[in-house]
């Protein structure tokens, strides 16, 4: 089930993967086990990292942070993902781009945002 997706990071090169099903002990990169990412646990400004959204009919307009996250070359949101019971939608972002994107409204889905410096952040769509 997609809703149970877990994200892992390589502490050496920064690769991130989403594990939908399987044994996380099998996940290796750069010769070492990948580490589970725990959302909302980094010591960083919550108001700049937690995804926020506004419902517009059958979509949501998502951005990262009540105060929009900076999108600089050395500090930016790499991607936003919406994970529901049966699918994951991921939008890749780039430095100097806005974090704003539109996704389908999926009540109960989880929105994730991944900051290249401060890790994984999430919120639930109501």
Segments and roles (model prediction):
Residues 10-13, 29, 115:
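Short cysteine-rich clusters marking metal-coordination/redox-active sites
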Residues 117-126:
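Edge beta-strands of extracellular beta-sandwich domains
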Residues 23-33:
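Cysteine-rich micro-motifs
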Residues 62-64, 98-106:
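Exposed aromatic-hydrophobic patches
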Residues 1-5, 12, 19:
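Intrinsically disordered, low-complexity linker/tail regions enriched in polar/charged residues
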Residues 64-72:
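Short amphipathic, basic-aromatic surface patches that mediate peripheral association
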Residues 7, 26, 112:
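Residues immediately within or flanking Cys/His clusters that coordinate Zn2+
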Residues 17, 33-34, 119:
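Cys/His-rich microdomains that often coordinate metals
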């Amino acid at each position: 089930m997609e809703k149970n997706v877990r994200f892992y990071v390589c502490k050496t090169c920064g690769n991130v993967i989403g594990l939908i099903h399987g044994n996380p002990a099998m996940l290796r990169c750069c010769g070492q086990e990948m580490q589970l990412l725990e959302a909302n646990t980094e010591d960083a400004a919550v108001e700049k990292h937690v995804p926020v959204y506004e419902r517009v009919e059958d979509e949501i307009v998502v951005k990262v942070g009540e105060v929009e996250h900076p999108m600089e070359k050395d500090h930016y949101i790499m991607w936003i993902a919406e994970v529901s019971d049966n699918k994951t939608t991921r939008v890749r972002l780039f430095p100097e781009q806005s974090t704003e994107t539109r996704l389908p409204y999926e009540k109960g889905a989880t929105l994730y945002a991944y900051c290249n410096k401060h890790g994984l952040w999430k919120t639930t769509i109501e």
